[in-house]
């Protein structure tokens, strides 16, 4: 596992963000190579045997970001794992021979996929120094939506908390004096508050230039598309008090919800983020 994650992480750091910008989904394109590396380490492969395994995996490298908002995107992970295993089985049980130079600087995987030159030293110098599982480390999603929406969702949660624990809101809807923690929890369990939206003219979500590229749906029609829509995510937070994971599974988003989302706009007035950074909070 460590070996597979290490190679996958290093490759990802060398080709992204350009790889993503070109429309590739690295879970599929890089994941298959990581899977093969993990299998090779598990089976004790070295030299030519390992090179052929990585070669056969690399030639199956695929996964395109136009699948975002569909079941095709998470399927990339399964296909990458399957193809890594299949590459190993083919080489073990057939007489198949493959190139032993999948990462040749002049015409190998990096040159073909990313049009960049990467040498063996570029990988070796990064190998376990200190290790991809240590730096940058593993990061797990709490909710099933695109990570590009995390900051916007957290900002919306702050706004929602202030609104739903305010004296005016609590008095109007609960006819009791406000207790911030208690009333906030009450909102988390409540049905969506569309009356709240009657008082909203516009919700503005601020981004650095290009930081919302993965959030491709401004008016999603399904829950799956909503995973890649800051509008749908912010709507959930403001209507319920928190993101509702079940809403990403619905087949059709109601018109009333779409009307609320139409009041959410994006502006690009925040400082540009370094291409090597990934904002997670």
Question: What residue ranges belong to the model's regions?
Answer:
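Terminal-appendage/accessory-domain detector
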Residues: 72-82, 89-281
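Glycine-rich, mobile lid/loop segments that gate access to catalytic sites or pores
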Residues: 1-86, 98-106
């Amino acid at each position: 596992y460590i070996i597979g994650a290490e190679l996958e992480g290093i490759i990802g750091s060398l080709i992204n963000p350009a790889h993503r910008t070109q429309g590739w989904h690295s879970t599929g394109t890089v994941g298959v190579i990581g899977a093969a590396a993990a299998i090779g380490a598990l089976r004790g492969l070295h030299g030519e045997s390992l090179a052929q395994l990585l070669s056969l995996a690399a030639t199956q490298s695929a996964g395109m970001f136009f699948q975002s908002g569909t079941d095709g995107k998470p399927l990339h992970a399964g296909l990458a794992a399957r193809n890594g295993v299949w590459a190993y089985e083919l080489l073990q049980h057939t007489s198949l021979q493959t190139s032993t130079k999948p990462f040749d600087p002049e015409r190998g995987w990096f040159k073909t996929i990313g049009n960049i030159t990467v040498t063996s030293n570029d990988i070796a110098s990064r190998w376990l120094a200190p290790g991809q599982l240590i730096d940058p480390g593993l990061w797990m999603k709490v909710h099933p939506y695109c990570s590009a929406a995390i900051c916007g969702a957290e900002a919306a949660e702050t706004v929602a908390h202030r609104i739903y624990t305010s004296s005016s809101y609590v008095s109007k809807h609960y006819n009791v004096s406000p207790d911030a923690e208690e009333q906030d929890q009450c909102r988390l369990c409540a049905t969506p508050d569309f009356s709240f939206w009657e008082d909203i003219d516009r919700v503005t979500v601020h981004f650095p230039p290009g930081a919302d590229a993965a959030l491709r749906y401004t008016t999603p029609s399904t829950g799956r598309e909503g995973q890649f829509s800051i509008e749908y995510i912010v709507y959930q937070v403001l209507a319920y008090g928190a993101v509702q994971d079940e809403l990403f599974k619905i087949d059709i988003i109601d018109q009333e919800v779409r009307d609320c989302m139409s009041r959410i706009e994006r502006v690009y007035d925040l400082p540009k983020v370094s291409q090597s950074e990934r904002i997670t909070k």
